């Protein structure tokens, strides 16, 4: 190959960057460097985590052949993590699904049959029959959908409309229930609005970083690179890391803290006590912008009502609270002394004091980061509320360089699951189904009869499993998620319902995942840049991308599937007569006509697309579907502090952080001069609350739902590793990533292994009260648990660690605690 000087320099740059990242350059990328003229490049956000890195996607001859960090992307500034560099390969696994597959025997659907290729029409025929039968015989509560924080914004919006408005069922929930629900409820309780007030620009201005249950070095490596740069370039910057086991983020920590599982609640209250005792309250901020409330306690563990722990709870599921005085709050946290905290947590006193001093020092700008260690917690909402307390006591919030920041794990857990409102209780822009006014706003905008959207909260993720097992939920469609592997308590609460002959399970996915193979019908699905999309990341940044290639075979996007399936239903088949009587003009129309092909949605012509621009859905339907859905959805938040920019602006920009008012994005919410909703002279205004004040909650320590005992003598914590993402359904199909971490292992303290006659590399049976798996002993490596705790990642389909986990949830958020259950080990 003959290279120009420019191409030669680019080739060297690629090789150098790859070497610095510890990578070999994929052969296809090597070839690409010298063939720039043949490659078409376009922008997109990364397909993986909630950081929202920008990438440049290289396509050639209808395939994605290369990917590089986008130097113009403000999030990552041209840098990718190891997963981002291999994005092209996630799309071309050898087992990519290209046609619908139905379990059949003797030419007909059979629950025990073999997967057999069928057409899309045949697939929709079977689905139509199953949905209509369930709706007719048992009503809207017998059908459900499990969606995703990986849906595009308009896919989530279309799904929510179809179920909540079309089928009149709120039984739709996203997999973000398993990762971000506690953050959502925490934000709503404290501030009255969801999502962080700060942004990534805080990193370069902060004096201290505190990680609560967040291994950012592996789970948010690009943000970690920015924190590392800040720490190493300024000797006065401090990093504290709190976890139940030692991981890679500890390598940068000035104060690395290992605490007993569940006792983070104790540490949080101790710091609040320290702030008060040392007169470190920002009195001006506190007196003007904060209310105090005492929350209900002994609220249970989100288990089945028949479980002994639920029967014993005095206030199961209670979100109640009552006003309290400062003196009462001071007395409440005073119980969390240094001595008591050290005893309950196992953390040395000097480390606790160092941590508390960071928050108490008025000259230190502090950012608190957290992810699943806080959220996947039976008191996850409380943990979120308690960390907000520290920032509200000190006034370290809504200003550059300081604030509490909940990091998301999925690319659009914020933009789709939360902002669109695909949770069983939510509607767009923080509205909820239980509020009559909110339902009325949606019904009027959607031009459907008053009373169409049910007021009853639908089934959340874990409740869906239980309802399937109990035969109450009979038709279940999952999209863009692998919950059979990712959800808790597989043996007792999920697999029985999926394989129950009363139930029909549909899985839409690009690959034959554990979930797909447990289903009755598999729908082949387009992924990432095989469709036009939009994600919303952790810092409220909404990012768009164009369709850049076509999906293989007959694979179709989730949006196409939802919209085309809606054609199978007429209003009189899904709505009662009293609703139809309110809008007789809708009688005889299909849900496609009522929900999607409306004047509001269909008013943008396909001619707005460039002549050579791919957009399979819009060109098939004859109007710009994505733009119509987005503009209708964006209407709900404009003028209400959730303002999104016009559709076309996002295709021009590298994302914009809402609220976007008069073309300007917002970096810091709730503070004067930064937020357009805070007027001059107000200073701060937490306008999600009627009085503009945030809430400090008094909430105590309460124990975990399950803890080690004489028989099951170890804590088990589960999570991720750098090389793989969630269940590995994409990353394990990338040879380089698979080789880097080919199978899950059980990380264990060497002394715990020795006490059980186990050595590194031994096979071991990990047993809980719910199931067992075989894994490999690892006494070294990146994760170093303390004695009494073992850690196991969940990416490996051959080691389904969620056979072990308990389906205990936070009673307020309904989010599962994947970090704490009890296990024992048996040598194999």
UniProtKB/Swiss-Prot annotation:
Cofactor detail note: Binds 1 [4Fe-4S] cluster. Binds 1 molybdenum-bis(molybdopterin guanine dinucleotide) (Mo-bis-MGD) cofactor per subunit.
Organism lineage string: Bacteria, Pseudomonadati, Pseudomonadota, Gammaproteobacteria, Enterobacterales
Protein name in the entry: Periplasmic nitrate reductase
Reactions listed under catalytic activity: 2 Fe(II)-[cytochrome] + nitrate + 2 H(+) = 2 Fe(III)-[cytochrome] + nitrite + H2O
Residues that bind Mo-bis(molybdopterin guanine dinucleotide): 83, 150, 175, 179, 212-219, 243-247, 262-264, 372, 376, 482, 508-509, 531, 558, 718-727, 802, 819
PANTHER family: PERIPLASMIC NITRATE REDUCTASE, RESPIRATORY NITRATE REDUCTASE
Residue ranges of domain 4Fe-4S Mo/W bis-MGD-type in the record: 39-95
Subunit: Component of the periplasmic nitrate reductase NapAB complex composed of NapA and NapB. Before export to the periplasm, the NapA twin-arginine signal sequence interacts with NapD and NapF.
Transmembrane residue ranges: none
Enzyme Commission code(s) on record: 1.9.6.1
Compartment(s) where it occurs, according to its Swiss-Prot or TrEMBL record: Periplasm
Effect of residue 6 to Q: Impairs interaction with NapD. Lack of nitrate reductase activity. Tat transport is blocked
């Amino acid at each position: 190959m003959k290279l120009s000087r420019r191409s030669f320099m680019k080739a060297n740059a690629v090789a150098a960057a790859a070497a610095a990242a510890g990578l070999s350059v994929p052969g296809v990328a090597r070839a690409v460097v010298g063939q720039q003229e043949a490659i078409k490049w376009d922008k997109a956000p990364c397909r993986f985590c909630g950081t929202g890195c920008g990438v440049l996607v290289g396509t050639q001859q209808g395939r994605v052949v290369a990917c590089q960090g986008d130097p113009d992307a403000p999030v990552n500034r041209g840098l990718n993590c190891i997963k981002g560099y291999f994005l092209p390969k996630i799309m071309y696994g050898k087992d990519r699904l290209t046609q619908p597959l139905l379990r059949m025997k003797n030419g007909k659907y059979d629950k025990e049959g073999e997967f057999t290729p069928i057409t899309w029409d045949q697939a929709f025929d079977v689905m139509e029959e199953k949905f209509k039968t369930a709706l007719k015989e048992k009503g809207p509560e017998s059908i459900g959908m499990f969606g995703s924080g990986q849906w595009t914004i308009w896919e989530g919006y279309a799904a929510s409309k179809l179920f909540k408005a079309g089928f009149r069922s709120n039984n739709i929930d996203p997999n973000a229930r398993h990762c971000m629900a506690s953050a959502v409820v925490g934000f709503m309780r404290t501030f009255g609005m969801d999502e962080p007030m700060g942004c990534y620009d805080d990193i370069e201005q902060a004096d201290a970083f505190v990680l609560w249950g967040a291994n950012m070095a592996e789970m948010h490596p690009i943000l970690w690179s920015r924190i590392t740069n800040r720490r190493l370039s300024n000797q006065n910057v401090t990093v504290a890391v709190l976890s139940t086991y030692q991981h890679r983020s500890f390598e940068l920590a000035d104060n690395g803290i290992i605490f007993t599982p569940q006792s983070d609640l104790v540490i949080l209250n101790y710091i609040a006590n320290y702030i008060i005792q040392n007169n470190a309250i920002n009195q001006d901020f506190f007196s003007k912008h904060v209310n105090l409330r005492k929350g209900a306690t002994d609220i249970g563990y989100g288990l089945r009502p028949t479980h002994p722990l639920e029967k014993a709870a005095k206030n199961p599921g209670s979100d109640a609270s009552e006003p309290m005085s400062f003196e009462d709050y001071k007395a409440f946290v005073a119980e969390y002394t240094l001595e008591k905290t050290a005893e309950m947590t196992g953390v040395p006193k000097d480390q606790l004091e160092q941590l508390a001093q960071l928050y108490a020092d008025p000259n230190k700008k502090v950012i608190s980061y957290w992810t699943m260690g806080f959220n996947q917690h039976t008191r996850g909402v409380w943990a979120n509320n308690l960390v907000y307390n520290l920032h509200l006591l000190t006034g370290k919030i809504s200003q550059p360089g300081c604030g509490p920041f909940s990091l998301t794990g999925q690319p659009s857990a914020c933009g789709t699951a939360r902002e669109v409102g695909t949770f069983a209780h939510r509607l767009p822009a923080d509205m909820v189904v239980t509020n009559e006014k909110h339902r009325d706003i949606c019904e009027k905008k959607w031009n459907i009869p008053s009373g169409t959207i049910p007021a009853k909260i639908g089934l959340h993720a874990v409740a869906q499993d239980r309802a399937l097992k109990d035969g109450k939920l009979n038709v279940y469609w999952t999209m863009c998620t692998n919950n059979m592997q990712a959800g808790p308590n597989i043996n007792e609460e999920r697999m029985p319902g999926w394989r129950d002959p009363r139930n029909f399970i549909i899985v839409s996915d690009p690959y034959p995942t554990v979930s797909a193979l447990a289903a009755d019908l598999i729908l082949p699905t387009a992924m990432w840049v095989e469709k036009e999309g939009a994600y919303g990341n952790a810092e409220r940044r909404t990012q768009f991308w164009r369709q850049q290639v076509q999906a293989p075979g007959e694979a179709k996007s989730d949006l196409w599937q939802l919209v085309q399936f809606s054609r199978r239903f007429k209003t009189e088949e899904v709505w009662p007569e009293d609703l139809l009587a309110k809008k007789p003009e809708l009688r005889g129309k299909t849900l496609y006509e009522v929900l999607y092909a409306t004047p509001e949605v269909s008013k943008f012509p396909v001619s707005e697309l460039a002549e050579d621009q791919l957009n399979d859905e819009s060109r098939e339907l004859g109007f710009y579907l994505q733009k119509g859905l987005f503009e209708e959805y964006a209407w709900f938040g404009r003028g209400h502090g959730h303002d999104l920019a016009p559709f076309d602006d996002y295709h021009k920009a590298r994302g914009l952080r809402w609220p976007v008012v008069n073309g300007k994005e917002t970096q810091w919410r709730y503070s004067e001069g930064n937020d357009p909703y805070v007027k001059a002279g107000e200073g701060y205004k937490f306008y999600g609350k009627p009085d503009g004040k945030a809430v400090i909650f008094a909430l105590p320590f309460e124990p975990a739902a399950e803890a080690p005992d004489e028989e099951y003598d170890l804590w088990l914590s589960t999570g991720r590793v750098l090389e793989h993402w969630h269940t590995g359904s994409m990353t394990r199909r990338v040879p380089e990533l698979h080789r880097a971490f080919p199978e899950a292992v059980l990380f264990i303290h060497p002394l715990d292994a020795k006490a059980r006659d186990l050595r590194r590399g031994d096979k071991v049976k990990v047993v809980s009260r719910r199931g067992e798996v075989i894994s490999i002993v690892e006494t070294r490596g990146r994760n170093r648990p303390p004695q009494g705790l073992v850690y196991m990642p969940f990416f490996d389909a051959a080691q389904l660690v969620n056979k072990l986990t308990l389906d205990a949830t936070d009673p307020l958020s309904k989010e599962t605690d994947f970090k704490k259950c009890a296990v024992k080990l048996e040598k194999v």
